[in-house]
Amino acid sequence: MPISVDKAVIARLKIQGETFEILVDPYLARDFKEGKNVPIEEILATPYVFKDAHKGDKASEKEMEKIFGTSDPYEVAKIILKKGEVQLTAQQRREMLEEKKRQIATIIHKHAVDPRTGYPHPVDRILRAMEEVGVRVDIFKDAEAQVQDVIKALRRVLPLRIEMKVIAVKIPGEYVGRSYGEVRKFGRIKKEEWGSDGSWMFLIEIPGGVEEEFYEKLNALTKGNAQTKLIERKGL
């Protein structure tokens, strides 16, 4: 169900000396700008394009055709979202910024380790370091796409090494059913084979920061009966 007009915010695009506005759900608009597949109909509070949303002054089909090459309000709305700016409230901007920072810090926690210890830095420590170095985070850009730049900045105050680990695992047949899907969530299966007793043997490549979590999950799934061996550590 689309957001109500009173809770929507304005997305605005100034182009060729003209201004076009739409009323949008701020959070779905953010997701759309990040590149997520969000139907435009769900983002819009109303299926109209305005010259001035506050006054209710709608853009004519002729104006839209001239500037955008189409009079379809949904297609025009997509262009406004992609190229324009979403007018967030101060609270929305603050909430989205904190959420994005935590997403980035969590990714770094999973993929990077402290080279002095081989263990990942806690998320809160990474967040504090981000504040210390004054990392600039883009609310409307996907978290994954910002990680490398953030890591470069953090290395001024926080020792970090991007690391992947390859682990050999053997899971007894009686636990394979419950383990198969869960294990694959951690990383990429590089090689696998099945034993005559139904056991599952495989090599999995996982981010260095989730190694401990991976072992804990395996133990829970197999009641401690999984066999593991660290085969390779790869710094990136």
Curated annotation (Swiss-Prot):
Coiled coil: none annotated. Gene3D superfamilies: 3.30.70.240, Ribosome maturation protein SBDS, N-terminal domain, SBDS protein C-terminal domain, subdomain 1. It holds the Pfam family SBDS_C. It comes from the Archaea. One of its GO terms (biological process) is cytosolic ribosome assembly. PROSITE patterns: UPF0023. Belongs to the SDO1/SBDS family. PANTHER family: RIBOSOME MATURATION PROTEIN SBDS, RIBOSOME MATURATION PROTEIN SDO1 HOMOLOG. This is Ribosome maturation protein SDO1 homolog. It comes from Pyrococcus horikoshii (strain ATCC 700860 / DSM 12428 / JCM 9974 / NBRC 100139 / OT-3). The lineage of its organism: Archaea, Methanobacteriati, Methanobacteriota, Thermococci, Thermococcales.
